[in-house]
């Protein structure tokens, strides 16, 4: 397919009577259009173009970007909040448990010497009576402190109830990330194929002088600047 610029050049050569130059230009255009590399590049361009169009109009991508990602962000914030609340409750309960445990430990240390004397048979009757009273007091203390410890441990256990709900939220976010990853891999695969094809044909393409980037597309009537124009161009080339 001859371009507008090439058609203008061909007409100009014919008007100037430069028949040989016109024939060479026509032969170049014809051979370029029937070049296998040209066809491969055209087909690859069509595939890439369609993939990009599908990427742009994919309603699922739009839904993910506008709805599910913001929703996932809010859900993760919720997980952070619930985790923070549970951590604070747990730490507060532990802080309340520590003095109780320390007090029990100190009481046991105070009674241990007399208890060792009793076990070794080296205790007087008066000390034995005193030991019995102290043990009775210790039992009462243990009874009260153990009840308090049980309450604090229950508080710690209840603070962990967030895990079931937050676990479900995290799994949902992971599924969303996996879906986004899958769709991005599909897009990258298309680009990867384009790059591989470009490298394979690099030596051949080097023999064709490139026109270079279009620096003033608004002034060029042969430049494409929209999706519809790309479609029309590819269709006119037979792809």
Curated annotation (Swiss-Prot):
EC number assigned by the record: 3.1.3.-
UniProt-recorded Gene Ontology molecular function terms: phosphoprotein phosphatase activity
Domain of life: Bacteria
EC class of the enzyme, as a word: hydrolase
Listed GO biological process terms: archaeal or bacterial-type flagellum-dependent cell motility; chemotaxis; regulation of chemotaxis
Gene3D superfamilies in alphabetical order: Helix hairpin bin
Family annotation (InterPro entries): Chemotax_Pase_CheZ (IPR007439), CheZ_family_phosphatases (IPR050992)
Subunit-structure text: Homodimer.
PANTHER family tied to this protein: PROTEIN PHOSPHATASE CHEZ (PTHR43693:SF1)
Protein name: Protein phosphatase CheZ
Source species: Vibrio cholerae serotype O1 (strain ATCC 39541 / Classical Ogawa 395 / O395)
């Amino acid at each position: 397919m001859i371009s507008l610029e090439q058609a203008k050049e061909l007409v100009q050569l014919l008007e100037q009577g430069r028949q040989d130059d016109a024939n060479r230009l026509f032969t170049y255009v014809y051979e370029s259009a029937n070049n296998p590399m040209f066809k491969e590049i055209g087909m690859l361009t069509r595939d890439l173009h369609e993939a990009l169009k599908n990427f742009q109009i994919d309603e699922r991508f739009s839904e993910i970007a506008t709805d599910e990602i913001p929703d996932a962000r809010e859900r993760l914030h919720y997980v952070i909040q619930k985790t923070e609340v549970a951590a604070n409750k747990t730490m507060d309960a532990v802080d309340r448990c520590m003095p109780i445990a320390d007090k029990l430990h100190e009481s046991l240390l105070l009674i241990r010497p007399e208890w060792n004397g009793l076990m070794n048979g080296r205790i007087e009757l008066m000390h034995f009576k005193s030991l019995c009273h102290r043990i009775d007091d210790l039992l009462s203390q243990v009874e009260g402190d153990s009840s308090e410890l049980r309450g604090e441990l229950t508080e710690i256990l209840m603070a962990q109830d967030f895990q079931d709900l937050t676990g479900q939220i995290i799994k949902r976010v992971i599924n969303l990330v996996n879906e986004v990853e899958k769709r991005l891999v599909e897009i990258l695969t298309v680009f990867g194929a384009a790059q591989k094809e470009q490298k394979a044909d690099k030596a051949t393409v080097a023999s064709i002088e490139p026109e270079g980037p279009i620096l003033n597309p608004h002034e060029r009537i042969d430049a494409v600047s929209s999706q519809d124009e790309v479609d029309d161009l590819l269709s006119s080339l037979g792809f």
